[in-house]
Curated annotation (Swiss-Prot):
InterPro entries: Aldolase_TIM, DapA, DapA-like, Schiff_base-form_aldolases_AS, Schiff_base-form_aldolases_CS. Its EC number is 4.3.3.7. GO terms for cellular component: cytosol. It comes from the Bacteria. Pfam families: DHDPS. Keywords: Amino-acid biosynthesis, Cytoplasm, Diaminopimelate biosynthesis, Lyase, Lysine biosynthesis, Schiff base. Catalyzes the condensation of (S)-aspartate-beta-semialdehyde [(S)-ASA] and pyruvate to 4-hydroxy-tetrahydrodipicolinate (HTPA). It is found in: Cytoplasm. Its main location: cytoplasm. SUPFAM superfamilies: Aldolase (SSF51569). The keyword Methyltransferase does not apply. The record marks T43, Y106 as: Part of a proton relay during catalysis. This is 4-hydroxy-tetrahydrodipicolinate synthase.
Amino acid sequence: MFQGSIVALITPFKEGEVDYEALGNLIEFHVDNGTDAILVCGTTGESPTLTFEEHEKVIEFAVKRAAGRIKVIAGTGGNATHEAVHLTAHAKEVGADGALVVVPYYNKPTQRGLYEHFKTVAQEVDIPIIIYNIPSRTCVEISVDTMFKLASECENIVASKESTPNMDRISEIVKRLGESFSVLSGDDSLTLPMMALGAKGVISVANNVMPREVKELIRAALEGDFRRAREIHYYLHDLFKVLFIETNPIPVKTACWMLGMCEKEFRLPLTEMSPENENKLREVLKKYNLPLKN
């Protein structure tokens, strides 16, 4: 079962290529700071602009660098089922601990199509699978009924990442799918309310910047200390907000550049932050006394 504090890791670039030195340093940073798992090649990892070869190489590199010290979850979804199967099979082959498979985007499948898609991936590849529900980007939402059917029939569908503000949906998933299924927040600002309803952790953007604090929030919530969890939530709330002042992952990668972790480099169609928003981000980071280097 996946739970705890999981980082949605950025993918650093340098001169147009994946910066593996910086990526290795980021992985070490999370090992040192007690993060429970890293997710590579997700939304925050700019997976849509990676080539197939880069995608596979990043996953393989992360698994080798982690060397069993921290779990590695690979983003392996796509809007073509055969591609999702291929990427998921590769993730298993190189030793990833699990796969995050996004709801197919753009082609807007029906619930039957979503069921067949995820069932095919789960049956073809025996690896723990997290369903990634993010309707703001996919334009379609997998229903709780469909998820319940999938989890009932496929033992390796073990969790969902929920990037939705719909708390009724979270309640329904927790109630119907039970303790053996992990609900993971996909939105830092909503992690605390989701965990109050029974979610078991977060796949976090803010974790790239302040992993120890996010880990403490999750620890407190899992132990039922919601007073402490609430204190940390409000302490981090300004960070949660500013990291989404522009499209993710633009602000968080810019924050990592300010902290000297990577270059400030994106691939089109993503571009650098506006100067105004970059200044807002810098002021928030200063508030937390973070060691700014750029």
